[in-house]
Design a protein with these regions (language model features):
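Core nucleotide-handling region used for phosphoryl-transfer chemistry
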Residues: 2-475
Length: 475
C-alpha cells in the first residue's frame, strides 16, 4: 500500500490547482498542475502541456505506454485522462472540461474477448493513424492531438513534417476548389492554413468536440494503405463527437461530414461481421469494441495477429535506435534486439569503434543500462537510509541537493518505489535495473545518457564511457 492518499478524481486535482494558484508566484496553470501531479507522484505517468496563447487552458494526458503497476493508486484518474483539455479559470464545474477523449482501447485477443461478449457491445472499424482533436473554446477553434495542444507542433513518424502540415494537405485536397492557382503558389502558408481551417470549421458545430484519425502516407505506423487508397493517400476519418456540455458521445451514424469528403468507419451489426471483415482484408487494422459497464464507456481493440505482433515488437519511431532501446527495455525473452534488427532494420548502419570494428547494439545498450543502474544505485545508497520495520526512509538532503535535477528526480522515484512496493529490504541493484527498464520512457533514458556523456565525476569505466558517448550521439 502507498503511504499517502491520492486525489479521488479529476475535480480534486483541479480544486487543488486553484487553491495553489492563489498563493503561487507562478501565473501558469500548467506549471501549478504539474507541481500538484509531482506532489502525488502522478507525474510523469500523467503529463501536462500548456497552451502558449491561452493561460487558462491546459492539456492533461496520460502516458499511454506507462507501466500499469505504477498507476495502481490512481488507476481511474489515469484511465480517465487519456486527453483532457481543462479551463482552469471557469467557476462552473460543468465547464471545466473543454474537450475529452475516450480511454485508449485496451488490446485484447479475439479468444479473450469471446469470453466476455455482451449484447450491448458495439463494433467499429479501426484505422491506423494519429488522433486529431477539434473543438471550439471562447469562439476560437483549436486543433490538437491527444498529447499536444497544437497540431502544428505535433509529429511522430516523419522526422520534419508536423501533423498540422499533413492536416493542411488533407484539407487542401478537400477544399482545393476554394483556392486559385495564384493563392496556392504565392500566398503565405499561414494564410492558406487559416483559410483551410476556417472553411473546415464552418461545417462543424461549436457545441461539439470532434475526434478524427489522420491517415496519411507520410504518417504510417503499422499499415501502408497505398494499395487500398492509392499512392500519396491522405484522409480524415471522423470517429467520434462529444457534446461539450454533457460530455456524452453523439451518434454520428448519419455521417454528418461525409458531404465534404470526410471518411467514416464501418459499423458492424455483430462480432461475426466485424471479425469476418477483419480477416478478409489484408489492409485491416482490426476493429474497436465499445462496452458500456456501469463505470462508463470502455474501449477494446482486436486486430489480426500480424498487426498485434508488429505493435508489440516495433515502436515505429523514425530513429531506429529509439526502437532498439525500447525493445531492450521490454526485456522479452522471445523478442530481442537481434530479432528487431533481422525483421525491421536490416539496413542499420552500426557504429564503429576506435579499432574500426562494428559495435554490437545489444552490447552497447546493455552496457549503458547497466551503467545507469550502477550510478543510480550508488547515489541512492549514499543519500538514503531505510527502516523496513516502519517503511520509512531518511534522505541526506545536503548531499542530494548537490546532484543535477535529472539525478534527483530518479532518486526520488526510487525512494517512492522503496516505500510503495513495501520492500522488506533496502533496494538492490536488480531492483534499480528493473526500475530503469520498466518505469521509464525513452526520453528519461536519453536525459540520463546525455548527462553522463557530457559530465564527469560518476566513476564510469572507460568501456562504459565509450558506449554512453556512442549512444548519446545516435539517440
Amino acid at each position: 500500500m502507498n503511504t499517502f492518499n491520492y486525489p479521488q478524481n479529476l475535480y480534486d486535482i483541479v480544486n487543488e490547482v486553484r487553491l495553489s494558484s492563489q498563493d503561487s508566484i507562478s501565473t501558469h496553470y500548467a506549471t501549478i498542475l504539474q507541481n500538484v501531479l509531482k506532489k502525488y507522484h502522478m507525474w510523469p505517468a500523467m503529463q501536462v502541456k500548456k497552451f502558449y496563447n491561452n493561460n487558462s487552458l491546459v492539456l492533461l494526458h496520460n502516458s499511454y505506454n506507462y507501466n500499469q503497476d505504477d498507476v495502481v493508486g490512481f488507476k481511474q484518474i489515469f484511465d480517465d485522462c487519456r486527453s483532457i483539455v481543462l479551463d482552469m479559470n471557469t467557476d462552473s464545474k460543468e465547464k471545466v472540461v473543454v474537450s475529452y477523449a475516450n480511454n485508449i482501447p485496451t488490446r485484447v485477443s479475439i479468444q479473450d474477448y469471446a469470453k466476455n461478449i455482451h449484447e450491448t457491445d458495439k463494433y467499429q472499424q479501426a484505422f491506423d493513424g494519429t488522433m486529431i482533436t477539434v473543438y471550439n473554446y471562447d469562439d476560437t477553434w483549436y486543433f490538437g492531438t491527444t498529447s499536444c495542444p497544437d497540431v502544428n507542433h505535433s509529429s511522430f513518424y516523419h522526422p520534419t513534417k508536423t501533423h498540422g502540415e499533413m492536416l493542411n494537405e488533407v484539407l487542401m485536397r478537400l477544399f482545393a476548389n476554394n483556392f486559385t492557382d495564384e493563392e496556392i503558389h504565392y500566398h503565405d502558408k499561414k494564410d492558406i492554413e487559416n483559410k483551410l481551417r476556417t472553411i473546415f470549421t464552418s461545417h462543424l458545430d461549436k457545441q461539439c468536440a470532434y475526434e478524427f484519425v489522420l491517415v496519411h502516407h507520410e504518417n504510417k505506423h503499422i499499415i501502408d494503405y497505398s494499395n487500398l487508397l492509392g499512392e500519396g493517400y491522405m484522409t480524415l476519418c471522423h470517429i467520434n463527437s462529444k457534446d461539450r456540455v454533457t460530455l456524452e458521445d453523439i451518434n454520428i451514424h448519419n455521417q454528418p461530414l461525409s458531404s465534404i469528403g470526410i471518411v467514416y468507419p464501418m459499423n458492424y451489426a455483430n462480432i461475426n461481421d466485424a471479425y469476418n471483415d477483419m480477416v478478409s482484408s489484408e489492409f485491416s487494422y482490426g476493429f474497436i469494441v465499445a462496452k458500456y459497464p456501469d463505470t462508463g464507456k470502455k474501449l477494446f481493440k482486436i486486430s489480426p495477429d500480424s498487426i498485434t505482433f508488429k505493435e508489440e515488437t516495433d515502436p515505429c519511431k523514425p530513429n531506429i535506435w529509439h526502437n532498439i532501446l525500447s525493445v531492450y527495455m521490454k526485456n522479452r525473452k522471445d523478442f530481442t534486439i537481434k530479432d528487431y534488427i533481422n525483421i525491421y532494420a536490416t539496413d542499420i548502419v552500426l557504429p564503429i569503434d576506435e579499432q574500426g570494428r562494428t559495435m554490437d547494439p545489444t552490447y552497447l545498450v546493455h552496457t549503458m543500462i547497466s551503467t545507469l543502474k550502477d550510478v543510480l544505485y550508488n547515489l541512492y545508497v549514499a543519500t538514503t537510509t531505510y527502516n523496513p520495520k516502519t517503511n520509512r526512509f531518511k534522505m541526506n538532503k545536503e548531499l542530494d541537493s548537490q546532484f543535477p535535477p535529472v539525478i534527483r528526480f530518479h532518486l526520488a522515484q526510487l525512494r517512492l518505489k522503496q516505500q510503495s512496493d513495501q520492500y522488506q529490504h533496502f533496494l538492490r541493484p536488480k531492483d534499480v535495473y528493473q526500475y530503469i527498464c520498466k518505469n521509464n520512457n525513452i526520453k528519461n533514458i536519453k536525459l540520463l545518457v546525455n548527462l553522463l556523456a557530457t559530465n564527469g565525476g560518476y566513476n564510469i569505466s572507460e568501456r562504459a564511457s565509450v558506449c554512453i558517448t556512442v549512444l548519446n550521439n545516435v539517440l
